A protein has these predicted regions:
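Short, flexible loop/hinge motifs at secondary-structure junctions
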Residues: 1-153, 193, 222-223, 284, ...
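Catalytic center-proximal scaffold of phosphoryl-transfer enzymes
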Residues: 2, 38, 125-127, 132-497
Length: 497
């Protein structure tokens, strides 16, 4: 009996020990997740306690009436309610009432469900009866617009909706198939995918190529990349990674442009080929693929460096205050606080402030690093991060000398975000042609948005009018369709409230 009791106690002790170990593992996991959350928050805001000596006042913008802001851009239809003539009688004396005016009561937004109809296209034909009498057939047929996709029943409006639903609303083609069926049209995923590929080849890619030519004349370009899976990539496994490279002009550019460039790998030759002939500054996260491009100046992202230090913080954030990683985060936060103060200044004034306020902090940052480099293990997270910062010191200092260089590459990261959100829904591209088409579509849509255009209206206009142009005879006509052209902005710019 005693042996049995002893065995039971030992088993319970073992169970408790295992549970205790599991609890500690869970605590570590939670702490790690909390650390990650803190890191993500820090990408967009500085630590409040670090701003005491570098403060600024933000003037709260007075809000307009919310209803006006939401409804100003919609068509308004006036509906007036009247009293039946037989009821226009005074309740007091029975006399006939006289009209004195009307009053506004409220707004109501009316939703009209989408609907389809078929436009049956005919053309008239004429003949010369006089020539006919002489045995000669002379006939004249009315011209008709070229179809957006030859030998297809799609239209610019339908194809634009397919494109916007996939690339703006992140709706996969299989879900769109159900929506089109609900509207009364059987439409296969294969048809929709082929339409997008044809439209990209015939209309979008020529525009993007022209945008690329003009981008090479910019002074600064943001660069970034993100993985994408392509199922039928020649010579590669289905599970292998391909990449979507993204290049953006800086926010000060007079011609805002975003270009997505699909490539089968992450080799350095990809940005080298895309940026051939560019001799300005590229803003990147420090990926080595951007570091060997002839003729360019490299500016590196401080947010990326800060993220590395956050990752180097101990799992238990309570013990982080005395660590080198935490000190680095605090030093970087002071730099970001200065940037927040000067974000609306001209480039020249930014450089002046950066030289006066930011440069001493940057000098201190790297001097402090070099002094502490030997206090941590080279193979540790903090050691690797210190080495990263020292290796990229020149590029991290670039913003001090150039007012057009931002401290971060966040603009390009925001440009990529719609692609990454869409990728979670449609998961992969079936073919390289599909991936290239997606790159062209994203380029036009994100550039349109950067130029404050309505993406649907702009895409529909391209699909409606570009098929009617003879670009062989008049190649310069292509510039008329670029998102920043005066004609396009006049037609499709979303007006500010």
């Amino acid at each position: 009996m005693a042996d049995s009791t002893t065995g039971t106690i030992e088993n319970l002790a073992l169970v408790m020990a295992n549970l205790s170990h599991s609890i500690e593992e869970l605590k570590a996991t939670i702490a790690s997740l909390n650390s990650t959350i803190d890191s993500l928050k820090a990408e967009n805001e500085c630590e409040p306690k670090l701003l005491e000596d570098i403060s600024y006042t933000r003037t709260k913008k007075k809000q307009k009436g919310k209803i006006d802001i939401k409804l100003d851009n919609l068509k308004h239809v006036k509906k007036v309610y009247d009293i039946d003539e037989k009821d226009r009688v005074c309740d007091e004396c029975g006399s006939k009432l006289s009209y004195v005016g009307e009053e506004f009561v409220r707004h109501e937004v009316i939703y009209e469900p989408a609907k389809l109809y078929v436009k049956d296209i005919y053309r008239k034909t004429y003949e010369c009866r006089n020539c006919r009498k002489k045995g000669k057939a002379v006939m004249l047929k009315a011209g008709t617009p070229q179809p957006v996709v030859p030998h297809s029943y799609t239209s610019p409006s339908v194809l634009s909706q397919v494109i916007i639903d996939k690339y703006v609303n992140h709706m996969p083609l299989y879900r769109q198939k159900s929506e089109w069926k609900r509207l009364g049209m059987e439409l296969s995923r294969t048809n929709m995918a082929n339409w997008i590929i044809i439209a990209a080849k015939e209309y979008f890619i020529p525009l993007v190529n022209r945008m690329h030519e003009l981008m090479m004349k910019e002074s600064h370009i943001h660069c970034d990349e993100t993985p994408v899976q392509v199922l039928n990539e020649p010579g590669k496994k289905v599970t292998s990674k391909s990449y979507m490279w993204v290049y953006s002009s800086i926010k000060e550019s007079k011609r805002p442009v975003k270009i997505f460039d699909y490539r089968p790998d992450r080799k350095a030759t990809n940005p080298q080929e895309f940026l051939k002939g560019f001799d300005g500054t590229i803003i990147t996260d420090g990926y080595y693929g951007y570091n060997h491009i002839d003729g360019v100046t490299n500016a590196y992202c401080w947010a990326h460096a800060r993220r590395k230090f956050y990752d180097a913080l101990p799992v238990d954030m309570k013990n982080a205050s005395d660590t080198l990683a935490n000190t680095a985060v605090e030093k970087i936060a002071r730099l970001f606080a200065i940037e927040k103060q000067i974000e609306t200044l001209s480039p020249d004034k930014k450089v002046k402030v950066r030289q006066e306020k930011s440069k001493p902090l940057v000098d201190d940052f790297f001097s402090w690093y070099k002094d502490n480099q030997n206090k941590v293990l080279t193979a540790s997270k903090t050691g690797k991060t210190i080495q990263y910062a020292l290796n990229y010191e020149a590029g991290l200092r670039s913003f001090l000398e150039d007012g057009l260089v931002p401290m971060t590459n966040s603009l390009d990261e925001r440009t990529i975000r719609p692609f990454t959100v869409g990728r979670k829904n449609w998961l992969f591209s079936t073919s390289t042609k599909g991936a290239e088409a997606s790159a062209a579509v994203f380029s036009l849509i994100e550039t349109a948005k950067s130029n404050k255009l309505n993406p649907y209206d702009y895409i529909e206009f391209i699909l409606d009018y570009l098929p009617q142009q003879d670009l062989v005879e008049d190649p310069e006509r292509l510039d008329w369709f670029l998102p920043w052209s005066e004609e396009i902005k006049e037609k499709f710019e979303i007006k500010a409230d």
